[in-house]
């Protein structure tokens, strides 16, 4: 048997009341605690597996709505930074639930690495439990407030010239760049794409490549090279 768990205190931190408190108990049970238990109990690994998928969905939806013009590759880059072990560990710390983890005496979480893994898994298992008990809505309400604000997510995407250009034009002109594409087929049947990027209906850059995405990046980089250099004082977006 595990020691008494203050269900009410944990629910207050999660801002969620379980109809099946047993799910919360399971979510708090680290595999090492199960291994040292004299009686058969269920550990958190299955809930962790579920919570990982739920977290991915919630973060994907959040980014999709927050950045309506970002391409999927850039969104994936940002998502990876918001669902990794370091991020999940931070969410557990923000919720203040780490001390409730039931962990075996032989498990070392004194080191930063040990705490990172244990806390990250705890958040995912808790999220899985909330989802099973209440569905996607309370799982979303638990997760979204923990995510960093828009201005802190943007740097996660800044390696892509399209994103840098978008940040620049939004800050300077409150408009989004527009990409116009023309497909060109040569005599051998090879297709390439000619892209123009327009800002306020003015052509800022052009790109040509066999991939539409790559041509857009080339056009965006040309726009940054030309117009960004003219506005170096305002490029820190």
Curated annotation (Swiss-Prot):
| GO BP, sorted A to Z | mRNA processing; regulation of gene expression; rRNA processing; tRNA processing
Q: What EC number is given for this enzyme?
A: 3.1.26.3
* InterPro entries reported for this sequence: dsRBD_dom (IPR014720), RNase_III (IPR011907), RNase_III_dom (IPR000999), RNase_III_sf (IPR036389)
Disulfide bond sites = none
Q: Where in the cell is it found?
A: Cytoplasm
Active site feature: 52, 124
Q: Give a GO cellular-component term.
A: cytoplasm
GO molecular function term, any single one: double-stranded RNA binding
Q: Which UniProt keywords apply?
A: Cytoplasm, Endonuclease, Hydrolase, Magnesium, Metal-binding, mRNA processing, Nuclease, RNA-binding, rRNA processing, rRNA-binding, tRNA processing
Top-level taxon of origin: Bacteria
Tell me where in this chain the RNase III domain is found. 7-135
Q: Principal localization?
A: cytoplasm
Catalysis performed (reactions): Endonucleolytic cleavage to 5'-phosphomonoester
Cofactor requirements of the protein: Mg(2+)
- Which positions does UniProt annotate for Mg(2+) binding? 48, 121, 124
Name all DRBM domain ranges.
160-229
* Membrane spanning residue stretches: none
The cross-references to Gene3D superfamilies, in alphabetical order and at most eight, read: 3.30.160.20, Ribonuclease III domain
Q: How does it assemble?
A: Homodimer.
Stated role: Digests double-stranded RNA. Involved in the processing of primary rRNA transcript to yield the immediate precursors to the large and small rRNAs (23S and 16S). Processes some mRNAs, and tRNAs when they are encoded in the rRNA operon. Processes pre-crRNA and tracrRNA of type II CRISPR loci if present in the organism.
The record's family statement is: Belongs to the ribonuclease III family.
What is the name of this protein? Ribonuclease 3
The organism of origin for this protein: Chlamydia pneumoniae (Chlamydophila pneumoniae)
């Amino acid at each position: 048997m595990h020691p008494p768990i203050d269900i009410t205190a944990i629910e207050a931190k999660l801002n969620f009341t379980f109809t099946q408190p047993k799910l919360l108990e399971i979510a708090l049970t680290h595999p090492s605690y199960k291994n040292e238990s004299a009686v058969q109990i269920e550990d958190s690994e299955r809930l962790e597996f579920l919570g990982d998928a739920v977290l991915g969905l919630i973060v994907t939806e959040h980014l999709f709505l927050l950045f309506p013009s970002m391409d999927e590759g850039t969104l994936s880059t940002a998502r990876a930074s918001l669902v990794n072990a370091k991020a999940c560990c931070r969410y557990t710390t923000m919720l203040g639930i780490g001390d409730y983890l039931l962990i075996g005496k032989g498990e070392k979480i004194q080191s930063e690495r040990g705490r990172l893994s244990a806390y990250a898994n705890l958040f995912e298992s808790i999220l899985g439990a909330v989802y099973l008990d209440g569905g996607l809505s309370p799982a979303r309400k638990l997760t979204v407030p923990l995510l960093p604000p828009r201005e802190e997510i943007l740097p996660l995407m800044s390696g892509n010239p399209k994103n840098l250009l978008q940040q620049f034009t939004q800050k300077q002109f409150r408009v989004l760049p527009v990409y116009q594409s023309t497909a060109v087929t040569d005599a051998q049947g090879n297709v390439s794409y000619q892209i123009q990027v327009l800002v306020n209906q003015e052509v800022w850059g052009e790109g040509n490549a066999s991939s539409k995405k790559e041509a857009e990046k080339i056009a965006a980089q040309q726009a940054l090279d030309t117009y960004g250099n003219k506005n170096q004082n305002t490029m820190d977006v």
